[in-house]
Amino acid sequence: MNDLTGQTVELLQTLIRNRCVNDGTDASGNETRNADVLRQFLGGTGLELQQFGPTPQRQSLVARIEGTDPTAPSLCLMGHTDVVPVNAAGWTRDPFGGELVDGPSGPEVWGRGAVDMLNLTSSMAVAFRHLATTGFRPKGDLIYFA
């Protein structure tokens, strides 16, 4: 695996293992665990990071790479960090194990949210951090929200 792929896999595994299960109640989700992981992952890039949400345990993270033209349109990379409840009987592996296994077409990460949508949330975070650390400046603002 190349470095960016490896970072994506590790971040995805961490997000899965945090068990941010949203059952539709205000007390569920605990997305702050994943927002904190993303804050740490994007930290040290010089980006302004903001965390907010309706309750202390239901936080989201926003980061922005400022564009060079304030009149240019912005682009938002948006994901979510919660998952729906699990019926353990329907799983052959631990749904919160984040296991990296050999699949038919190569390595696969198994776990709740691995394909909806923690995979995209983690890959966008890795790409966003890579752009930020290489000095990339888009014409319009580039925003990461999860």
PLM region spans:
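Active-site metal-coordination/substrate-binding segment of hydrolases
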Residues: 71-143
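N-terminal helical capping/dimerization or prosegment-like subdomains
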Residues: 1-88
